[in-house]
């Protein structure tokens, strides 16, 4: 039985912050989806400068977090190995809920469409997490059973002061890596006989194209507002914030569908 979604404030950005502070993964996921369902009943105060009342992000005691290179790699030939891989993906999706909620509450003074876009992203990430957790439970495991790393939130913290840097380096960089990584993961899980995992990853890939497109749209909007060239600015931001360099193979069709220009796609191989 899923926990009931916690009550949330009637103002969208305050509600997003309250959910980001929530430490229970299932309550966070359920609450985020409930917030999206109630979106037409919520007010929006885009001007208010909010302050967290608890450390961010709220998260459970487990999984234990460690550097990515210390997270054990397991064979997909075993159920435990498949569960470990699915747990790693679930952890990414849990962090993605936090990333979207943070983009929603943190930055004042943006158009209402920006906040609505990131609410949709948060709800879809919550759906992905729920699908993966349900599949994990079917394999005899749960979220928190394996160790994980914290790379996604690290970049979120680095860009906490600047929505332009956030749009450039979280959705357009870190989340775009998922577009490249998903098809090989689908092939591996398909070879291991996990058809349900392949189906879930297909849902995730479809939605993530839209999420990266939202990041592209608001990155370009913020560049236009500041009179900046989005293509020329990106490598400067990537170097300044020490963003990871994209690694091949690239899913060029998905990246194109997500709004990367031909010039940007050509630069991937430069």
Where are these regions (language model features)?
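Non-heme di-metal
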Residues: 1-270
